[in-house]
Amino acid sequence: SIRNIELNDRQLQKVRDQFIFQCYTGLSWVDLYMFDYDRCTVEHNGVAYIDGERIKTGTKFYTPILTPAMEILKKYDYKFTVPTVQSFNRSLKIIAELIGLKKPLTSHIARHTFATTVVLANDVPIETLSKMLGHTKVSVTQVYAKILNSSVEKHAEKLNSII
């Protein structure tokens, strides 16, 4: 897996870790590039949140820094040096080849992973995900929210037990 592969190249290690950070925060590449922990995080009930503004749209977003993301932040002393998007995606392509991934791996895939695998698969409402991603309309978030078969099956079981 991308998390466990042994990488000898320092640049590949950093990009891998930053990609995983994106998977657990939903940040786009440009928001990761501009991320400043001291300037845009707040703490509430012992959980750190990114309280920021999307670079692309200027829309406010508010998302938790989940434990795996916080571990990565600590590893890099809360500061990332993010390469250009081209270099970032080139590194991800190399990593994908090393782990035998057939589909292309890009920084934007991390944002989709956050939306589907991390958030929606754990029954977080789409309206909450929309706020986390900094979308002004839930209809934009629905592009990310391809309904997962497992979610349909789980809810069907719940409905069958009620009816």
Where do the PLM segments sit?
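Phosphate-coordinating loops and pocket residues in cytosolic domains that bind phosphorylated ligands
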Residues: 4, 34, 143-146
